[in-house]
Amino acid sequence: MFDALANINWEVIFQLTSVALIIIAGPAVIFVLAFRNGNL
């Protein structure tokens, strides 16, 4: 089990996760601002 975890490239996973969050968060923030008429 530890060998399997060691073989995982955590840096790549972290980068992919970061990119995914940015891609999802971008439109989400725009949608929230539009939904609230730009009022924070």
UniProtKB/Swiss-Prot annotation:
Segments crossing the lipid bilayer: 12-32
The keyword Transmembrane is annotated on this UniProt entry: yes
UniProt topology in membrane: Single-pass membrane protein
Compartments where found: Cellular thylakoid membrane
Major location category of this protein: membrane
Pfam family membership, one: PSII_Ycf12
Domain of life: Bacteria
Cystine connections: none
UniProt record, GO biological process: photosynthesis
Subunit and partners: PSII is composed of 1 copy each of membrane proteins PsbA, PsbB, PsbC, PsbD, PsbE, PsbF, PsbH, PsbI, PsbJ, PsbK, PsbL, PsbM, PsbT, PsbX, PsbY, PsbZ, Psb30/Ycf12, peripheral proteins PsbO, CyanoQ (PsbQ), PsbU, PsbV and a large number of cofactors. It forms dimeric complexes.
Function in brief: A core subunit of photosystem II (PSII), probably helps stabilize the reaction center.
Family per similarity comment: Belongs to the Psb30/Ycf12 family.
Protein name from the UniProt record: Photosystem II reaction center protein Psb30
Originating species: Nostoc sp. (strain PCC 7120 / SAG 25.82 / UTEX 2576)
